Amino acid sequence: QQFSSQTLAKLTCLNPVQLRRVTTVLNQYQFIKTSRGKNGGYSANHSTASIKLSVLYRIFVLEKDSQQRIFTGHEQSDCEISRNIAKTMSHYNQKEHRVILNFYDTLTINDVINDTLQEDTTYDTL
């Protein structure tokens, strides 16, 4: 099934501009099919359902070029804490990403779809 960006944005309650940014990246990696023109839109392809969330996490989180400084401290400081805190927090951050990647490596787009569709009925029985 093919959806225009406007229709897809309405179905997912997302901003169409943000959605197009994501679909552009997904198309670059050939995770979806995109057709241009009056009747253009987006659709899943043969591999969409089996894409691991760890792959998407790498693309949308880890590979983003971040210029912001996320850890404080100064390596030339006389204060031991200031001198080492950035390195320590960087190690923690790397471990955090490994945990997340390991978790997401067990999930695919198909899992997200199935779990999302089950959410509507999960709380009806509680």
Predicted regions and their residues:
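A short alpha-helical element within helix-turn-helix/winged-helix DNA-binding domains
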Residues: 2-13
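Key DNA-contact positions within bacterial/archaeal DNA-binding proteins
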Residues: 17
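Short, hydrophobic-biased segments on the C-terminal half of alpha helices
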Residues: 23-24
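Glycine-centered, phosphate/nucleic-acid-interacting loop/turn motifs that mediate DNA/RNA or nucleotide
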Residues: 29-30
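Short beta-strand "wing" residues that participate in macromolecule-binding interfaces
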Residues: 34
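Minor-groove-contacting beta-hairpin "wing" of winged helix-turn-helix DNA-binding domains
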Residues: 38-45
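Conserved segment of winged-helix/HTH DNA-binding domains
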Residues: 48-73
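C-terminal regulatory/oligomerization modules of transcriptional regulators
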Residues: 70-126
